[in-house]
């Protein structure tokens, strides 16, 4: 376990102060614990803070629990534990143009990095635009079964009331609530009507 600190954290990442949760385990076979971490730091002149257990509503706040909420689509509950809304940031890319032609214009996001596997479905979101303004968003995380036969998961957002070009620019989405599961509609008109309904729902949920 000492090599984990000396070789990885100190030598490779040049760490001078380490912060860990109360139940942190590390090293070969998880032999390292917070007491060993604290002792090592004291002996080698490194700063060290151990974060005590924190509970909310009788549940221990942990990254594992928060991930499970996000994977279940419970973004509102996750925000209570995070202290802020779960967000995704990325670059807007060109899509297939289907939304602009037959539905609503959408922003297709390439996330900055690998993100936690959010439950597929439609969310009420707040979009942070490049000019500093915010607007309500209806975000689909999924494969868009009504308009595409590809099985690639995308993050596609209808920015309510926005009319502009965001291609190649950064966009941040804050996830406020889960609206519905992704489904295949019988026609693009039916999908259009549902997106319009979801937009009205989102406007009543999202705080700008």
What annotation goes with each model-predicted range?
Residues 94-208:
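Phosphate/ribose-recognition catalytic cores of enzymes acting on nucleotide-derived substrates
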């Amino acid at each position: 376990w000492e090599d984990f600190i000396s070789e990885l954290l100190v030598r490779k990442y040049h760490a001078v102060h380490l912060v860990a949760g109360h139940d942190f385990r590390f090293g070969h076979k998880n032999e390292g614990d917070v007491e060993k971490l604290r002792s090592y730091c004291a002996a080698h002149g490194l700063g060290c803070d151990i974060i005590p257990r924190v509970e909310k509503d009788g549940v221990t706040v942990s990254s594992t629990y928060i991930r499970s909420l996000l994977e279940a689509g419970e973004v509102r509950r996750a925000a209570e534990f995070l202290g802020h809304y779960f967000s995704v940031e990325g670059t807007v890319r060109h899509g297939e143009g289907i939304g602009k032609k037959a539905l609503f214009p959408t922003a297709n996001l390439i996330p900055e990095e690998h993100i936690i596997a959010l439950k597929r479905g439609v969310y009420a979101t707040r979009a942070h635009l490049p000019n500093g303004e915010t607007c309500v968003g209806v975000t689909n995380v999924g494969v868009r079964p009504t308009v595409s036969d590809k099985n690639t998961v995308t993050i596609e957002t209808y920015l309510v009331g926005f009319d502009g070009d965001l291609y190649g620019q950064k966009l941040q989405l804050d996830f406020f609530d889960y609206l519905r599961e992704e489904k295949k509609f019988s026609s693009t008109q039916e999908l259009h009507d549902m997106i319009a309904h979801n937009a009205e729902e989102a406007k009543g949920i999202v705080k700008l």
